[in-house]
Amino acid sequence: MTIEREQLEMDVLLVGAGPANLSCALHLTNLVATYNERATRSGAKPLDEINVAVIEKAAEIGSHQLSGAVLDPVTMRELLPDFEKHGQAPLEAPVGDEKVYFLTARGKFAMPIIPPSLRNHGNYVVSLNKLVRWMGEKCEAAGVNIFPEFPGAEMLYEGDRVIGVRTGDKGIDKTGKAKPNFEPGVDILAKVTVLGEGVRGSLAKQLVERLKLDAGTDPQVYSVGIKELWEMPDNRFPAGSVIHTLGFPLDSHTFGGSWVYGMRDRVIDIGLAVGLDYRDPRIDPHHEYQKFKTHPLISDLLKGGKLIRYGAKAMPVGGWYTMPQMTADGVMIIGDSAGMLNGERLKGIHIAIKAGMLAAETILDALVANDYTRARLRAFDEKFKASAVGRELYKGRNFHQAFDR
């Protein structure tokens, strides 16, 4: 049976409402407005109204983002220069006290010098879901269309050129058959589609496999990050405090480490990252996390506290050599979907924001030229690699590989 589907035409479609895509959408609307103002003043032809849409599978923007992160603000200052002023952005606290420990089963050794990659002076502890929600509000105020509960199901092609995305059908039973409340997904057509759907995004996997965008790259390597939010009875771990640890509960052959971040209202974010390339098949990352909480450093910290949220997510930690070709005809890949995470620094938000801005600049050029081919969009690959965040990833290109030796 052929299903009739509604078609929605956009100029730019962004799949996933994370930091990369939201920064892209916001920066693009600002760039288009600036371009049209200059064109009007100079007598040139301005662009027609540009329709930008963000689709997100979650019920609310930010609800699939796990709280707790340390933000390097350098790229956010480029996107929104005043974000630190007047309490505009939902920042938990500037990083204050920092410690790095090597843990044994019952003891700890403080590192006398914090490794440069883990120094966070000048950075901010943030709640990522609050930050993303705030960025979404900025986008909507700028005229971006944001559609929550619209998961992307499959790419739409003309030959090998991407022309949009089909959203998921609703009202399907467990066997795949339509129920009485069946609603077919929508075909959203766009001149440029930007995939920023997070690590191992389903559409990015389809695209990379079909167009062989990972040819000549190393296979991506993943870690799983397990974290909890605890509400404490007192201010024993002030907002802005940061701890990172190595060692227990992981053995010397397993890639990973832990963190504790102090947030507002006596909440702490505590987590453990475990490389999924572990050698011992008996390792269970969730069990390792429970062991981690039995260490005296952590158990004493959590005493009397209340668990208020739990979550886990995969992280792409393979680095520079695992990143795919990020553009093809009509499409771009950014953020975690493209492996834009610095595993050495445990940071990716600032990289995602800059990638979104560079993608927006490339899309503006494509809109002006009315050219959405790989030949035009590949400028993004080049801009990203030449940028400060690209150089940062290149500098740490062998970090994970060093653990395999």
Give a label for each model feature:
Residues 1-9, 37, 175-185, 336:
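A short, basic/flexible loop-to-alpha-helix module at the beginning of a structural domain
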